[in-house]
Amino acid sequence: MKAFVLIVALSAIGTAQAQSADADFLDRKDATHVTGQQIFTHICQGCHMADGKGAVGAGHYPALANNPKLAAAAYPAVMVLNGRGAMPSFSRELTDAQVADVVNYVRGHLGNAYTDTLKPEDIKAFRPPATPDEDN
């Protein structure tokens, strides 16, 4: 019983530290210098897996590896910004440059070889409208 309590306590501490690290990573002031690969590693691979092959279990996490839907650069950009189903929106957490960087990384890696890239100015068109509390 004591071992079980210890395992649960250590798991909770590890989870809290991981959530804190993710929250720190998403701070726009600190994250402006990160690469698309780093964004993928810290944000995307938790669900889509390090190899981009996705997962099925408690939920369905689509594969990004060898994904023909990524042929249209707008598709992953819209998904990152707006989310869909279990995929959360990252429009408030990521800048236009960060969205472009992570989309370009995924489209050029993980078995994908799309060479056309998005620029930060392309991302603005895909952003959802600002809510009243974001305007302030």
Regions found by a protein language model. Give the residues of each.
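Flexible coil segments in periplasmic/lumen-exposed cytochrome c-class electron-transfer proteins
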Residues: 19-26, 96-97, 101-136
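Stable alpha-helical elements in mature extracytoplasmic
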Residues: 32, 72, 76, 98-99, ...
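Gly/Gly-Pro-rich "capping" loops immediately C-terminal to redox-active cysteine motifs
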Residues: 53-93
